[in-house]
A protein has these predicted regions:
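Bacterial signal peptide processing site
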Residues: 21-24
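Mid-length scaffold segments of soluble, non-membrane domains
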Residues: 89-153
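A cross-kingdom marker for long, charged
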Residues: 189-220
């Protein structure tokens, strides 16, 4: 029992020490310093997330969790045949081309224009506070920009027709006919997946910062 109490005391002390270090780093920041920190946090998180779109992003666990149910069903069905797997490859390729090209500049511009007065509250906003703000501020704008880009990529590389063909008779019950189009589903999944991956990257950077600015802010 004494060992258990001692362990609890030690863990509590460590937690309080870490919290104090973070608060100490945040307490003395000017609005401009806080803004520099938020921008470093978001720029690093977005770069990390966008790298994930360079490979087989549909196999990314975070991406899969963020997908709308309709897209998750489609990708699962496609994985059951060689024709479907080829179609998945085209879908991955379309995402890898469209998402980084559109999202990189858009997110960078939004990040540059974050008001300095909001910066400190974003740093104090929890593990994914900055990403949550960015999603709320730019999520709809990003989705609107991604939709035509993804549609074009899937049209140009033959992905739309390949996916429809691979789904066969099930296609009509999954896409269109009052349901979201395939491009809409993919855009929704790409948008939510990107922000989910950014949130993971932000959390990791807060807990174990690699950026010199963030090391100072988060007391690591």
């Amino acid at each position: 029992m004494k060992k258990f109490v001692s362990l609890l005391f030690t863990l509590s002390f460590v937690f309080m020490t870490q919290s104090c270090n973070v608060n100490k780093g945040l307490a003395g920041l000017s609005p401009q310093q806080a803004l520099t920190g938020v921008q470093a946090l978001l720029n690093g998180s977005s770069k990390s997330a966008l790298k994930g779109f360079g490979g087989n992003v549909l196999k990314n666990a975070v991406m899969q969790k963020a997908m709308p149910k309709g897209l998750s069903t489609i990708t699962s069905l496609l994985g059951n045949s060689s024709e479907g797997n080829k179609a998945l490859g085209l879908l991955n390729g379309a995402l890898g081309s469209a998402v980084p090209n559109v999202a990189s500049s858009l997110l960078s511009n939004v990040t540059k224009n974050i008001p300095a007065a909001d910066a400190l509250s974003l740093l104090k906003g929890g593990d994914t506070g900055a990403t949550d703000f960015l999603k709320k501020t730019a999520g709809k704008k990003l989705a609107a920009a991604l939709l035509p880009a993804i549609t074009k990529q899937l049209t140009d590389n033959g992905g739309l027709s390949a996916i429809t063909s691979a789904l066969g008779s099930k296609a009509s019950s999954l896409i269109g006919n009052g349901k979201p189009s395939l491009a809409d589903l993919v855009t929704s999944g790409a948008t939510d997946g990107l922000f989910a991956m950014m949130g993971n990257a932000e959390k990791a950077e807060r807990n174990n910062p690699t950026d010199p600015i963030l090391k100072e802010i988060f007391g690591k």
